[in-house]
Amino acid sequence: MRKRAEPVPPEHESFGRAPLDRECSIKQKLRIPGTKGHYPHDSDCDSKGMKRFGRRYGLWSRLRMFLIFLLGLYIAIPFLVKICPAIQTQLVFLNLVRFPYFIDLKRPEDQGLNHTCNFYLQPEEDVSIGVWHTVPAVLWKDAQGKDLEWYEEVLSTSYPVILYLHGNAGTRGGDHRVQLYKVLSSMGYHVISFDYRGWGDSVGSPSESGMTYDALHVFDWIKARSGDNPVYIWGHSLGTGVATNLVRRLCERETPPDSLILESPFTNIREEAKSHPFSVIYRYFPGFDWFFLDPITASGIKFANDDNVKYISCPLLILHAEDDPVIPFHLGKKLYNIAAPARSLRDYKVQFVPFHKDLGYRHKYIYRSPELRQILRDFLGNTEQQ
């Protein structure tokens, strides 16, 4: 006959309080049917175990609910974008994302541009755009305390002009943009930059046609004051789409710029959106084009650089960093391969300049390149001796 396990004597009870999990395990092994409640700490074991189980179950329940919420959100977003194309339009323009947030665009000197004038133009009724005119650095002393009239008059002096068209998000006062203005100004260029309607302190609702018209208005304003001085157009990121739209229109009316510079360009907005890092989690989602790309096209947004370059008749320079995480390098290279053999560019120089990924210039830091000055001198001509 099996011997019944003896109860733990009270005087030895303290030795049984070693880790509770081990005690419970030993008791389970020694217990005989019918002895439930015989051990003094059985209720403690059951209580602790239930609490531990409850905590684990509660954690798993919350995690499961969170995962279900994420899955529901993941599935719902494509339908929201399809039903409300304005969401996708905002993702393209990002004009409401303004950074730096606390700068006064009326005071470019706060950004270190003490030879810059701020003013406003009105391309259309109910549309106003904020503009900065930065004169060549050699004129910075003369520019101190001068008014808009002086800045307009100095455009006719013997210095070339660059019209800069920025990308989405931010304003004309964005740091990487300001740093580029300084580089170009130090090389002897006037730099005209502005915020499209709906960006910064400019008034109006953004659209591709509206942005292009704003750029055309500023270009005509420059040409009316710059005399025979060269006028170049520089577009960056989304601004390359505005730039090719503008230059195509200028070429069609036979008033092309002296050169076009595209920094970090894409082929067209559909290919760019499909390659954008934001699209990674949906790129293989069934019906991706229908959900995400068709609403962009339906909103009248194309920015068809690949088509526009076939109708451009002026020298073309493309700059692109291999480590660009926003607009993949291969899109800039593809655009060059389309432009180089184009009939309209047959008599003009078309150049593609890559920047190695080890340099770390990514999407918006090509201005840091020590070679940029020489690249521009070789392509546009030297201005620093003037």
UniProtKB/Swiss-Prot annotation:
Q: Which GO terms describe its molecular function?
A: lysophospholipase activity; monoacylglycerol lipase activity; phospholipase activity
Question: Cellular component GO terms, alphabetically?
Answer: endoplasmic reticulum membrane; membrane
Source domain of life: Eukaryota
Q: For this chain's UniProt record, which GO biological process terms are given?
A: acylglycerol catabolic process; monoacylglycerol catabolic process; phosphatidylserine catabolic process; phospholipid catabolic process
Quote the subcellular location field of this record.
Endoplasmic reticulum membrane
Signal peptide region: none
Q: Which SUPFAM superfamilies match?
A: alpha/beta-Hydrolases
What residues form the membrane-spanning segments?
67-87
Where do the catalytic residues lie? 237 (nucleophile), 324 (charge relay system), 363 (charge relay system)
Extracellular topological segments: 88-386
Instruction: Give the membrane topology.
Output: Single-pass membrane protein
**EC number(s) on file:** 3.1.-.-, 3.1.1.23
According to the record, glycans are attached at: 114
Q: What is its main location?
A: endoplasmic reticulum
Entry protein name: Lysophosphatidylserine lipase ABHD12
Q: Which organism is it from?
A: Xenopus tropicalis
Lineage, highest ranks first: Eukaryota, Metazoa, Chordata, Craniata, Vertebrata
